[in-house]
């Protein structure tokens, strides 16, 4: 969740994002960066810079390497550079410079993927990174890109050159033609892979529908309806076995859908009437909760299979528990920016 150019909450938070398995989340601040354990909530690392904002932080699971990009009012690093930070040495150990601003960075143990506004560059994760691939995209100001973290699957997904299309490339065999998915008619706003890299979920800027595709064939598996009114989708995430997804939007709600068993999702009683528009046969979330503050948030599943975590731009942390029938209760509420590492 990129909060640049300004965060209305005035708490210095510029960016928040989960690591690959959602076990941690990292925050870019106007004066450094922080790393937290997601569930249970615990501050793991706090690196403060005297002068310098960090607009993007990308973790690599729980290892000591993080990718940093400068941001905020006084960026710590130029926004056209990717800095690889070694948290054991407490310093940057790799630096990659570009001619334009960096929109996002993705890491896996052998690759650094850098997203620019109309292309994606792939490098070796070595002391002197070597450029391996360049992929063209449509204009991509949000830096949409997902990299499968599974060691047996080198799948990279990003917006194609055509509006609403998703391109899937296997970095282990780039000679194979990419899978091109015409996911939406409008501009993409969010994409997410499951941990195994077998499913991809997509949303457009309209934000009413979430679509799930098979990554090997590109076939549509499910179409899910978040709502009837347009919304800005901030985040989509699968759970560990890809049976569920959670979705957050600017309506202040987090929706939970069944990704594998469509019967669990709610459907209109008029769904079987063939003369009615497709809207009435839509599959709706079986559970949802309202973030009390209504603040922009990212969401992911917690350590318990029936838990969803919301990390909000105003510094609030919520953990909700949901039942198989969809009832939802708030379990934890905290202010993560006000924590110190010995509070929890």
UniProtKB/Swiss-Prot annotation:
Gene Ontology MF terms in the entry: phosphatidylinositol-3,5-bisphosphate binding; phosphatidylinositol-3-phosphate binding; TSC1-TSC2 complex binding
State the superkingdom: Eukaryota
Kindly name one Pfam family recorded for this protein.
PROPPIN
A single GO BP term for this record reads: cellular response to starvation
Keyword Ribosomal protein on this protein? no
Q: Which UniProt keywords apply?
A: Autophagy, Lipid-binding, Lysosome, Repeat, WD repeat
Keyword Repeat appears in the UniProt entry = yes
Query: Might you report a single GO cellular component term?
Result: phagophore assembly site
Its main localization is other
List where in the cell it is found. Preautophagosomal structure; Lysosome
Q: Where's the motif L/FRRG motif?
A: 224-227
InterPro entries (UniProt xref): PROPPIN (IPR048720), WD40/YVTN_repeat-like_dom_sf (IPR015943), WD40_repeat_dom_sf (IPR036322), WD40_rpt (IPR001680)
Which windows of the sequence hold WD repeats? 183-223, 228-267
- Quaternary structure and partners: Interacts with the TSC1-TSC2 complex; stimulated upon starvation. Interacts with RB1CC1. Interacts with ATG2A.
Q: Which PANTHER family match?
A: WD-REPEAT PROTEIN INTERACTING WITH PHOSPHOINOSIDES WIPI -RELATED (PTHR11227)
Name this protein carries in UniProt = WD repeat domain phosphoinositide-interacting protein 3
Organism encoding this protein:
Mus musculus
């Amino acid at each position: 969740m990129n909060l640049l150019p300004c965060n209305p909450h005035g708490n210095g938070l510029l960016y928040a994002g989960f690591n690959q398995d959602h076990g941690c989340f990292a925050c870019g601040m106007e004066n450094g960066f922080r790393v937290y354990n997601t569930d249970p909530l615990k501050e793991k690392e706090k690196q403060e810079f005297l002068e310098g904002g960090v607009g993007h932080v990308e973790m690599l699971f729980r290892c000591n390497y993080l990718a940093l990009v400068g941001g905020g009012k006084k960026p710590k690093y130029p926004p056209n550079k990717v800095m690889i930070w070694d948290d054991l040495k407490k310093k940057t150990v790799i630096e990659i410079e570009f001619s334009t601003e960096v929109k996002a960075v993705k890491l896996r143990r052998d690759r650094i993927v850098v997203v620019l506004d109309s292309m994606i560059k792939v490098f070796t994760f070595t002391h002197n990174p070597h450029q391996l691939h360049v992929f063209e995209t449509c204009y991509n100001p949000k830096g949409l890109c997902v990299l499968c973290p599974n060691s047996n699957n080198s799948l990279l997904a990003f917006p194609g050159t055509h509006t609403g299309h998703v391109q899937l490339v296997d970095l282990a065999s780039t000679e194979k033609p990419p899978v091109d998915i015409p996911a939406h008619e409008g501009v993409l706003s969010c994409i997410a892979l499951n941990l195994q890299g077998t499913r991809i979920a997509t949303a457009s800027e309209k934000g009413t529908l979430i679509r799930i595709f098979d990554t090997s064939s590109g076939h549509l598996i499910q179409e899910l309806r978040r709502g009837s009114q347009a919304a800005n989708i901030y985040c989509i995430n699968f759970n560990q076995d890809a049976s569920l997804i959670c979705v957050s939007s600017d309506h202040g709600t987090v929706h939970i859908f069944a990704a594998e068993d469509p019967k669990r999702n709610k459907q209109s009683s008029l769904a079987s009437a063939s003369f009615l528009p497709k809207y009435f046969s839509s599959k709706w979330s079986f559970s949802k909760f309202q973030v009390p503050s209504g603040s922009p948030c990212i969401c992911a599943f917690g350590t318990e299979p029936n838990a969803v975590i919301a990390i909000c731009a105003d510094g609030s942390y919520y953990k909700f528990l949901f039942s198989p029938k969809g009832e939802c209760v708030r379990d934890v509420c905290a202010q993560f920016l006000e924590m110190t590492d010995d509070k929890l």
